[in-house]
Amino acid sequence: MLKTVVKKGSYHDSVVLMLLTNKISAIEGVKKISIMMATPANKDIFKQSGLDTEELMAASANDMVVVADIDDDALLDTIMEQTEEFFRQQSAKSGEKKGAESVKSWDKALQKLPDANLAVISIPGAYAALEADRALDEGMNVFMFSDNVTLEDEVKLKQKAHEKGLAVMGPDCGTGIIQSVPIAFTNNVAPGSIGIIGASGTGIQELTTIIDRMGEGVTNAIGIGGRDLNAAVGGITMMDMIDAMEDDDAVKVVIIVSKPPAKEVRDKIAARLSNFSKPIVTLFVGEKPEYHEENFYHAYTLDEAARLAVGLVRGEKIPEAVADVDESTFYKAEDHKTIKAYYSGGTLANEAAMLIKDAMDVKVPPEDIEGYMLQLDGNIVVDLGDDAYTQGKPHPMIDPAKRIECMQEAVDDETTGAVLLDIMLGYGSHEDMAGALLPTIRELKAKAENAGRKVFFIATVCGTRRDYQGYDEAVHKLREVGVIVCENNKLACRTAIRAIGRDFVEPEKEVRVKEVVDAPKGVPSEKLRALLSEKPKIINVGLKSFAEVVEQFGCEVVQYDWMPPAGGNVELIKVLNFLRHYDGLDIDEANREVIAKVVASQPVIIDNVRAKEVIPKLNTGKVILHAGPPVAYENMPDPMQGSCVGAVLFEEWADNEADARKLLESGEIHFIPCHHVKAVGPMGGITSPNMAVFVVKNMTDGNEAYCTMNEGIGKVLRFGAYSEEVVDRLRWMRDILGPTLGKAIRKLGGIAVNPLIAKAIAMGDEFHQRNIAASLAFLKEVAPTITKMEMDEKDRYDVIKFLSDTDQFFLNIMMATGKAVMDAARTIERGTIVTAMCRNGYEFGIRIAGMGDQWFTGPVNTPQGLYFTGYDGEDACPDMGDSAITETVGVGGRTGGRGRALVRPPCRYKICRRWRI
């Protein structure tokens, strides 16, 4: 039975609540429990765990919620008593430490530390991007520990930081060292002359700790987040940091560590590094390079990268470490034993999987299985820090429970010959992970021996002798119970591989002449130079433990005890940030700049082509564009779903309605708002790759916009119809009408839109409902050229007849025009002018000049108006379509007083249900 307790306004950070959940779950009689803040993301986690209740769903992001699956009602009192006691103990511990000064707002934080240059953010991902944006506005670099930040937000933040001469490290950045100050989950590493840039937290930890134990040190180790080398992000932070470290006189050697980047990003980085003026070592985990280049070294393992860097600093070759172990008791290959590897560090797990595959001589990559780095012939490598294991639960660096469970399962498997582990030391990690695992290891070794089996436990300890847990103490404890402890992860992997009778080869690499590419070098900003050369001044937003650590290292720090503002409502928070951004600015002046852009626009129809020729996103699989702000297929109204069916049939992705709907519901088709790809669409707005679109170019700014052609009135795709008649018309428009108009427009050198608008408005058009004059004016422009073109006479007649009969034909041209004009205007990114209005039958959305691509949405209305005979309000569909771009640009309904009122516009209607035959 599920029991729920909601603690209103009781905010606690996620790590504290994970530890609390772990403690309470051990109470006898508790089948399942989760204690989290009621953020939207956490509510999803509750739901996935089968713990969603009405009380939970009604709670706000500022409320702590306890949901427990228990049979005894009295047990709930025990749970809450222990919860309160846990918080009392936490408060007592905090009280014992002097700690950084705490504040409750950005304004107070900035008053306390006005020259802060780094914001460390560790709050729920839904809010992290908003706070990072605020930090950038205040001139601060950002270290974003938070995950679950959208790729779109990451791109915006990093572009903004680059423009301001700042850096965003992250999101999901777990490790950093800035001027010997450890940020987040980091080790206590000696200062030195090696700089590191990494898209990998535990990869940085392994590198820095090996370097430290070899007697060298690190200037700065900059985490950039796992997606920085994604094609969409483009390596923004990586490239800026490469420039900054080349400029830093304290850096003698640079190491770059990452998973393999996107090809275009990799090429850009390789070109830049080819003319880097200092020795550099690269490691793309999972790749096996075959050679080095002069002063440009390519490592296979983290150990090799660290040894290369230390050797370059010292000017000597550093030999590999060896394992002090008696191999005579190891298994032979014919014993067919397996390795079970359970890691808390993702990069270390990745390296282990790579080395085991190498040893097994795997030619074909094994199947990817969620939660596993490797699952091959009984050998498994698991990253226990993966989201599959940590949603709503403590990370394995701070809680041994999941690893203990996995080790028990491993020993129960009679094929297991070796169990491979990492022990992560450092700030943020368990205070004695080795000690916490000892009882289980001792018990499992005895269990295997009693069964007449050998199971070798092999570990690597990632840490330094400066770490508060004590490196030597951890190694000693493990060896006391018979664990083979190796100097680094590569050696631990090799030992485990040899323990089951196999090995891998790491041949010596030749050094080739470096091929230098003429690539541009950036000039690091003064703010980046300061970040890498001085102790940071930090505003810590979130986990208090991060502030406590940096203060120990002599940093000025203010602890911002963050709680979700505006009741956790993300949309309201965005509005508040928008208003803050404009506080003290001349909004009227900004608005005048935007309007000046609108007035200066010179839209010209330059072509008519297939949509996929001008919209790259339509070439990335099965993609359909729709009207309005983003909407899932299941939330689309019936007419829009019907339009999607028509598009699928038109594209021949299916040959009947049933298969089309099955495909649409499968998730295989990717839906994108037209507005996201410089397009607009009437009603459903459905646009697929091979549909014909007008191309309108704003000659003033050079930007383009696109819109499908008007099909006329009646059974048409935009109203949700998808019969054979509808699909055949679309194909005729693709094959005959579009190419004919495209050729005519190109022959004319384009058609200026402003003169057509001027003529038509004087004749009574308003360009949304009334377009007769403009449609005929367009026909007047193209008809003479069409009559002279070489083409089939019937096709010529059909084109002219269609244009003559379609009174609304100009609407779609006007929509593309409005989009081209407003897209140019919103490049100002200041002011409060609305730059887009649109509907998707589910939500009404607007964009504002000063907020860029951000959507502000609300429930869509159902229009009230006149209906055709036989229909009434019950048939009406909630409003949809991008055609309100006409009103946005200043025509449509806004010109009603200027044009002659010829007709009251009919309501949008839902009669498509009767058009499916």
Model-derived features: positions:
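Catalytic-core regions of core metabolic enzymes
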Residues: 1-521
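Anaerobic metallocofactor- and corrinoid-dependent redox/one-carbon enzyme cores
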Residues: 5, 48, 199, 321-405, ...
